[in-house]
Every structure is written in structure tokens, then in C-alpha cells.
Regions:
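A short, compositionally biased
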Residues: 83-84, 263-270, 307-309
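Short amphipathic, charge-patterned alpha-helical segments
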Residues: 87, 286-295
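Local cysteine-cluster metal-coordination motifs and their immediate loop/turn environment
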Residues: 162, 293-330
């Protein structure tokens, strides 16, 4: 016998129990959102696909920030992606970094990324010229965008890149949404002109005009009740938003950080390199990746957060170790 699609009253009348029907709807929405909530990331599936691309255009978007338009040499259609996705870019052999796609998911003729000049990887990207060749892998998505009638977006600095496609999709869907965009000053904040068409839905909040946010609560003001929160930017901002969101009737917090998370409560340990017989000490406040890079030049890495897999190394046991986050004694097949 097929169960009823609506919960019935217990008095035998056969009529729908309106209270239980409402609760059933709430639970369904909760399950849909919590399945990809910021409390537990969905697995990031490996994408065994290298894309040889060409730099079709470069633009200066702000102080220290450029955007690249990347296309296939013969104009082939690129793989599909959804807001929140990123690609691994290799501007030169042995160097891999991750960058969020910030263009239009419906435009499969090109990918667009925004890159702030900070560190070795971004320096190599900024040095590229129009017509340069670059290898991409992906796209992959560790920051999934869920359907909802309302949203609050919070971006800090270059953290605007994964948020941009989400804002466009939210606007196109007719959702109720707000964006809080923070940064050092307007000159350093990319894509301001692009965002200006959304009017009062976007609060541009540079520190030079408003001061550094005192708490996450300040950035959460005016958020639609129970709306999902999407946050990308510096770690202190993300921590503040997640902490204060837990104290109010907000929806799930989805977040992505571009910097390495701090090591909290770490303990020192040792790793051994089987082929050379070298034993290395890993201090409580450093990663295996940091220590190995000083001894084994050329080790590939990218996200430094444990989900991209670029830094995986083989152990003599046959296991593969993500040396940016895993902290235990191990002997590597090196």
C-alpha cells in the first residue's frame, strides 16, 4: 500500500493534519540545506581532466588584482560549472594554485578568475601576458550554492570572487538577498563597478570609511531570517560570522577561506624519508608540508586546507598522506 503523501490526523477522519504538514515541509527544507551546510563540507570529487588554456584577456580590477579570461585554443566549449567552483591553475611546471571562477556559468566559451598579487603562485599568474598558455584542472566545487528564497552574502577582499556568480544567480532567481562587501579601501576592492548595478542590495564597507568590523554580528545585521549565509574572506572574519550566526535565527553558514587555517592544539612529531634515511622534526605550530618543502624542493601544493589533494604523498604503507593537514608520524616513500 502506498503511504499518503500528506500526514493525516489521528482521529480517523482522513483529513490532513495541517500542523504536521507544516513541520514536514520545514524538515524537508532543513534536510536539503543541512546536507551541504557549512558545518560539514561535501566531498570534493577528484577531476582527472587537464585543460590546456590560453590567456585571452587580462584586466586590472583593483590595486594588486587582475582578472584573466581563459579560453581553449580552438574555441571549444569548456566543462560546465556552478557558482562556488574553482580550478587548479598551473602557470608553470610544478606550481599549482586554486582560483575561484568568477565569470558567468552560462558562458562556456571562457573561464574568468580574479587573482590578488600575494605569494609565489599569484606572482607567476600576474606575470602572464595575453596569448600565454596555462594548464587548468577542474572545475571542482567545495563551496556549493543551494537554492533558497533568500540569502546573505559576506565577502572580504578577494573573497568576492566565488561570491560574484552566486549574487548573479540569486538576482536572476528573484531571491531576496543582501551582500556585505568588506575590504581595506575601495581602491583595493575588485569588481565594484560590476556590483554597482545591484544598487542598495550591496553594502560596500571599506575599513577606511567604516573601521574594521568589531564582530561578526555587525556584518550579519539586516540578514533575512533563516537565510543561508555565504561567507568568503579572511579567517578572523569567517570565525566571527560563524560564531555570531550561531547566536541568532540564521540559516546554515557556508564558508570558504583562501588562507591557511591556523594550527590549534598541535603536537610535535617526526616524519621519515625512506630512500634518504632522513628524519625530520615537525613542530607543533607547523605542517608537514612546511617542513618537507625545506628539504625536498618542488613539492606540489595548492589549497593548503586538505581538500584539493595536490600535496598528497605516498607512505611506505601504501597510504597517501595530505601533508598540508595530516599530523601524525609517517615514513614517506621518498
Amino acid at each position: 500500500m502506498t503511504p499518503p503523501t500528506r500526514p493525516l490526523r489521528l482521529d480517523g477522519s482522513g483529513r490532513t493534519d495541517r500542523v504536521m504538514a507544516s513541520l514536514t515541509g520545514v524538515v524537508a527544507v532543513y534536510r536539503r540545506l543541512s546536507g551541504v551546510s557549512g558545518r560539514r563540507r561535501p566531498p570534493v570529487l577528484a577531476v582527472d581532466r587537464d585543460l590546456p588554456l590560453i590567456v585571452d584577456d587580462l584586466r586590472v580590477e583593483a590595486e594588486g588584482v587582475v582578472s584573466l579570461r581563459l579560453v581553449q585554443e580552438r574555441g571549444e566549449i569548456l566543462p560546465r560549472w556552478r557558482p562556488g567552483a574553482h580550478v587548479d591553475l598551473s602557470p608553470r611546471p610544478g606550481l599549482v594554485r586554486q582560483y575561484s571562477l568568477c565569470g558567468d556559468p552560462d558562458d562556456r566559451s571562457a573561464y574568468r578568475v580574479g587573482v590578488r598579487l600575494l605569494g609565489e603562485g599569484s606572482t607567476a599568474v600576474h606575470a602572464l601576458k595575453k596569448g600565454a598558455r596555462i594548464t587548468a584542472r577542474g572545475p571542482r566545487n567545495a563551496f556549493p550554492f543551494v537554492a533558497s528564497p533568500a540569502y546573505l552574502f559576506i565577502a572580504g577582499g578577494i573573497g568576492i570572487t566565488p561570491i560574484l556568480p552566486m549574487v548573479r544567480q540569486a538576482a536572476a532567481s528573484g531571491a531576496d538577498w543582501q551582500l556585505v562587501y568588506t575590504g581595506r579601501d575601495r581602491a583595493s576592492m575588485p569588481f565594484l563597478e560590476e556590483l554597482s548595478r545591484f544598487g542598495e542590495r550591496v553594502w560596500v564597507r571599506p575599513d577606511t570609511e567604516y573601521g574594521i568590523p568589531a564582530s561578526g554580528a555587525e556584518l550579519l545585521e539586516g540578514a533575512p531570517e533563516n537565510a543561508p549565509i555565504y561567507c568568503c574572506g579572511p579567517i578572523p572574519m569567517i570565525v566571527g560570522v560563524r560564531t555570531d550566526a550561531a547566536l541568532r535565527p540564521s540559516g546554515p553558514v557556508f564558508f570558504e577561506r583562501f588562507s591557511t587555517p591556523p594550527i590549534v592544539g598541535g603536537k610535535p612529531f617526526q616524519v621519515r624519508l625512506a630512500r634518504s634515511g632522513v628524519t625530520l622534526d615537525v613542530p607543533a605550530d607547523r605542517t608537514t608540508l612546511d617542513v618537507l618543502r625545506e628539504t625536498v624542493p618542488g613539492i606540489a601544493y595548492s589549497c593548503r586546507q586538505g581538500f584539493c589533494g595536490t600535496c598528497e604523498l605516498p607512505a611506505v604503507t601504501g597510504d597517501r598522506v595530505r601533508i598540508c593537514v595530516e599530523r601524525e608520524p609517517v615514513t614517506f616513500d621518498l
